[in-house]
Amino acid sequence: PTPVSALVHSATMVAAGVYLVGRFFPVLTPDVLLVIAYTGGLTLFIAATIAVTATDIKKVLAYSTVSQLGYMMLALGVGGWVAGLFHLITHAFFKSLLFLCSGSVIHACHTNDMRKMGGLLKVMPYTGWTMLIGCLAIIGAGVPFVLGFSGYYSKDAILAQALLFSRTNPQHSILYLAVAGGAFITAFYMFRLWFMTFAGSPRDQHVFEHAHESPRVMTRPLVALAVFAVAAGWALPGGLGVE
């Protein structure tokens, strides 16, 4: 069920490994952290490239989760304890939102295949706009020095830590390139998901004719999570001990 996927893929089971590494961070040696960083970089890149080719809406989000976990592991590996756990927290909000939005779409269309969707924003405005907010949050959209979505702050912290690590260890500059490149790929597959689902004209008229907005009991949680997907990053850095 999609609500279970939202819980499992955002902040519980899949995040346990990141949480464990974060707890053991003070006792890990530099060599071990370097292995963790490269493992995270490889994970985020491979999972992101798979998400680019997926046509099942839930599989795109599942591989997106794997990619974001790679980000967190890479952050921990390059010494960014705060950055890694900060991204873990912001990820919980926008990934829960994205999975629940996908569940709303599947509930309306009775299919997971994005190739049969298209134009759904006309009949599912609440789901469409809240999912766009989730997409903007996961790609780290924002205006530098002004305001950004929650992912903007956590991903920026990871980028800054990876850049600092690459400057002090030039032989490992590929880790920074992995973070930066992964951010571009993330933006591509998330916008691909949204445009294939909600924009353009319907590709399957039968699916479109039966599509409808979900009831309020399903859309209200989307709006609540959308608020946190936007604003979670505004307050959390101070709570983590970072001004």
Predicted regions and their residues:
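Hydrophobic transmembrane alpha-helices and their helix-loop junctions in integral membrane proteins
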Residues: P1-E213, V217, P221, F228-W234
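Aromatic-capped, Gly/Pro-kinked transmembrane alpha-helices
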Residues: V227, G238-E243
